[in-house]
Amino acid sequence: MSHAVKIYDTCIGCTQCVRACPLDVLEMVPWDGHKSGQIAASPRTEDCVGCKRCETACPTHFLSIRVYLGDETTRSMGLAY
């Protein structure tokens, strides 16, 4: 089942989510528009198993990264009609 990983602009570039992910779904990418110079990205969401360790590790308390599991993806992201 496919999961969506959404990185929000409240990401502080701390790398905690990247280090917490057991399957390397996340990585840090350069971003000039951020004071840390980097932001989390999720290029390999097809490998996400939905463990949500990235959410738990985030020091912004789920404000920067969210994992939407399978069926809840469109509903939770506000995409359902």
Swiss-Prot record:
- Binding residue positions for [4Fe-4S] cluster 1: C11, C14, C17, C58
The chemistry this enzyme catalyses reads: reduced [plastocyanin] + hnu + oxidized [2Fe-2S]-[ferredoxin] = oxidized [plastocyanin] + reduced [2Fe-2S]-[ferredoxin]
A molecular-function term among this protein's GO annotations: oxidoreductase activity
Q: Which residues bind [4Fe-4S] cluster 2?
A: C21, C48, C51, C54
Record-listed E.C. numbers = 1.97.1.12
Compartments, as annotated in UniProt: Cellular thylakoid membrane
**Residue ranges annotated for the 4Fe-4S ferredoxin-type domain, each copy included:** 2-31, 39-68
Q: Which chain positions lie within coiled-coil regions?
A: none
Q: Which UniProt keywords apply?
A: 4Fe-4S, Electron transport, Iron, Iron-sulfur, Membrane, Metal-binding, Oxidoreductase, Photosynthesis, Photosystem I, Repeat, Thylakoid, Transport
Query: What is the top EC class of this enzyme, as a single word?
Result: oxidoreductase
Q: Does this UniProt record's set of keywords contain Cell membrane?
A: no
One GO location term (cellular component): photosystem I
UniProt membrane topology term: Peripheral membrane protein
User: Can you cite a GO biological process for this protein?
Assistant: photosynthetic electron transport in photosystem I
Q: Which cofactor does it need?
A: [4Fe-4S] cluster
Tell me the domain of life: Bacteria
Task: Quote the record's cofactor note.
Answer: Binds 2 [4Fe-4S] clusters. Cluster 2 is most probably the spectroscopically characterized electron acceptor FA and cluster 1 is most probably FB.
Question: Which purpose does this protein serve, as stated in its record?
Answer: Apoprotein for the two 4Fe-4S centers FA and FB of photosystem I (PSI); essential for photochemical activity. FB is the terminal electron acceptor of PSI, donating electrons to ferredoxin. The C-terminus interacts with PsaA/B/D and helps assemble the protein into the PSI complex. Required for binding of PsaD and PsaE to PSI. PSI is a plastocyanin/cytochrome c6-ferredoxin oxidoreductase, converting photonic excitation into a charge separation, which transfers an electron from the donor P700 chlorophyll pair to the spectroscopically characterized acceptors A0, A1, FX, FA and FB in turn.
Subunit field text: The cyanobacterial PSI reaction center is composed of one copy each of PsaA,B,C,D,E,F,I,J,K,L,M and X, and forms trimeric complexes.
In its UniProt entry, what is this protein called?
A: Photosystem I iron-sulfur center
